[in-house]
Regions:
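Intrinsically disordered, low-complexity terminal tails/loops enriched in metal-binding residues
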Residues: 1-264
Length: 264
């Protein structure tokens, strides 16, 4: 691997269980698909001590993103932490397979956002998914969601999603995780995590908006990317999915700049 490849790898997050002296511990979870149980883990520091001090980011101290390695079975959840640093939540794998689990956090000790990841296996009869086609539109729970924008490796891309229902724009999007929508972007294949941030000011409690929500992001390499949009209407969270292709040359990371991190 040459120096440019090394720098690029360092700038892409969500590929390691350890970053900046913090380690995502072994994840315990139900061993079989469709089995009820608990998913639990700790995050430890360089001395092996579980960390208990985290800053809230996008309204939560930890964002847990879970997706099967073929890009299906996406979930974005928020476990609770006990006094000893053990994060947990009730859990059931809905399908057998290999899953990537991402913990998105801001340790108080550094004040820097990091993304740690591990792979977890759920045993059972595996049903492979057909690769999703390129798509900038999705329909979920009766809502039509369209995405406008092009991913690029050479500049920040503006991605605007628009939500409608029965042909009418939805103007009652509620605040969710500090914005009117939350977008996760993963590089197909290794499932590297992109930094994505919403545009505009944080909404006031009780405010509503719509039908458009805009995000900014930049792809590290050309290729296909899997995008997952969470939005909330009438206290219900819905998830739309898209597949985009990024164009342009691979980035050469500047070692003098801070590495990018995942959005939440």
């Amino acid at each position: 691997m040459d120096s440019n490849d090394t720098q690029l790898a360092a700038s892409v997050k969500g590929l390691s269980m350890e970053q900046d002296g913090f380690l995502l511990g072994e994840i315990s979870s139900p061993g079989l698909a469709d089995q009820e149980g608990t998913l639990a883990f700790t995050i430890s520091n360089a001395t092996g001590t579980p960390v208990t001090d985290f800053e809230a980011s996008h309204d939560k101290k930890l964002h847990l993103i879970i997706v099967r390695t073929d890009g299906t079975q996406f979930r974005h959840v928020h476990p609770t932490m006990d006094a000893h640093g053990l994060w947990s939540l009730p859990w059931k794998w809905n399908a057998a397979g290999s899953y990537r689990v991402y913990a998105d956090i801001v340790p108080t000790a550094t004040g820097q956002n990091i993304t740690l990841t591990r792979t977890v296996q759920a045993a059972g009869e595996f049903t492979p998914a057909t690769p999703a086609p390129l798509s900038a539109a999705d329909t979920v729970d009766g809502y039509d969601v369209d995405l406008v924008g092009t991913l690029s490796t050479s500049e920040q891309a503006m991605l605007t999603v628009s939500v409608s229902r029965d042909g009418e724009p939805v103007t009652t999007l509620q605040p969710y995780l500090g914005s009117y929508g939350h977008l996760v972007a993963l590089r197909e294949g290794d499932l590297a995590y992109l930094h994505v941030h919403p545009e505009g000011e944080a909404p006031r409690p009780g405010a509503v908006s719509g039908p458009d929500v805009t995000f900014m992001t930049e792809a590290p390499t050309p290729g296909r990317y899997l995008l997952y949009l969470d939005f909330q209407v009438d206290e219900q969270v819905h998830t739309a999915q898209f597949v985009l292709t990024a164009t342009g040359p691979a980035q050469s990371a500047d070692p003098g700049e801070p590495a990018e991190h995942s959005g939440h």
